[in-house]
């Protein structure tokens, strides 16, 4: 079945196909992720809008049994501030790849599309891209079938405690029940507290957010542990972020 639709869409990536053609993967609001064929991409009027992290309203010809086609576009947003900063662009690319990994092709998920779009808009507006990424990561876990409780102790259900996380139980322990898991994570109690807050944050009302560098580093390390344990995906974009962290540390040392 072939149908023409108009939909908001975010370009996830493109790759070469034959000599001058490209396959372009777009996450659309209406019909989910689709692969689109662009013939003679280098000379095509579509060339400006088939680059990664371009958001536009596309006129699309959708083919449920094969490749789809881009017929036209308007209302283009290119996120210039994101693209002008290597670090921000790396994190933006990662959250887009994470959304891609969490959703099957051809499956509509308008709430996820809106969440990804708002994340990129907040990065473009200058909010802390590392913290925005952590919030995106913790909220998108449900798309991988993972639900974690950072609000209460698994044994006594008390709230507002200096919680630690236990991979043995897959949830939090209060100080009175730390002994239940000798291999608990020994986290800074601020980490479970922040993740509990992050799970409830609504990006539509978020205006500012700021955390100290040390806390952000601890968050990053624990999020990596969570994803390794529960999700098990290894995205190239995440590996690039890790390499940038090493590079950034080298730059700091050279400036001393």
From Swiss-Prot:
It comes from the Bacteria. One of its GO terms (cellular component) is bacterial nucleoid. Involved in DNA repair and RecF pathway recombination. Plays no role in chromosomal or plasmid transformation but is required for resolution of chromosome dimers occurring as intermediates in the formation of merodiploids by transformation. Keywords: DNA damage, DNA recombination, DNA repair. Coiled coil: none annotated. PANTHER family: DNA REPAIR PROTEIN RECO (PTHR33991:SF1). GO terms for biological process: DNA recombination; double-strand break repair. Belongs to the RecO family. The keyword DNA damage applies. The keyword DNA damage applies. This is DNA repair protein RecO. Disruption phenotype: Mutant is sensitive to the alkylating agent methyl methanesulfonate and the DNA cross-linking agent mitomycin C.
């Amino acid at each position: 079945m072939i149908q023409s639709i108009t939909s908001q869409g975010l370009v996830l990536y493109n790759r070469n196909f034959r000599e001058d053609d490209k396959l372009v993967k777009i996450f659309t609001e209406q019909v989910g992720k689709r692969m689109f064929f662009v013939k003679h991409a280098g000379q095509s009027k579509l060339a400006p809008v088939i680059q990664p992290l371009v958001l536009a309203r596309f006129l699309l010809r959708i083919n449920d049994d094969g490749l789809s086609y881009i017929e036209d576009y308007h209302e283009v947003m290119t996120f210039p501030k994101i693209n002008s900063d290597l670090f921000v662009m790396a994190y933006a690319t990662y959250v887009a790849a994470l959304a891609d990994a969490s959703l099957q092709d051809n499956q509509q998920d308008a709430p996820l599309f809106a969440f990804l779009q708002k994340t990129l808009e907040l990065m473009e507006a200058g909010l802390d891209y590392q913290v925005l990424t952590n919030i995106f990561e913790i909220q998108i876990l449900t798309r991988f079938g993972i639900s974690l409780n950072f609000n209460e102790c698994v044994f006594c259900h008390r709230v507002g405690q200096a919680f630690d996380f236990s991979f043995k139980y897959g949830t939090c322990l209060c100080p009175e029940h730390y002994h239940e898991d000798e291999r608990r994570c020994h986290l800074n109690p601020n980490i479970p507290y922040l993740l509990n807050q992050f799970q409830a944050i609504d990006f539509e009302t978020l205006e500012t957010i700021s955390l100290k560098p040390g806390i952000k580093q601890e968050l990053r390390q624990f999020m990596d542990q969570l994803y390794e344990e529960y999700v098990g995906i290894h995205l190239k974009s995440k590996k690039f972020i890790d390499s940038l962290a090493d590079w950034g540390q080298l730059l700091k040392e050279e400036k001393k």
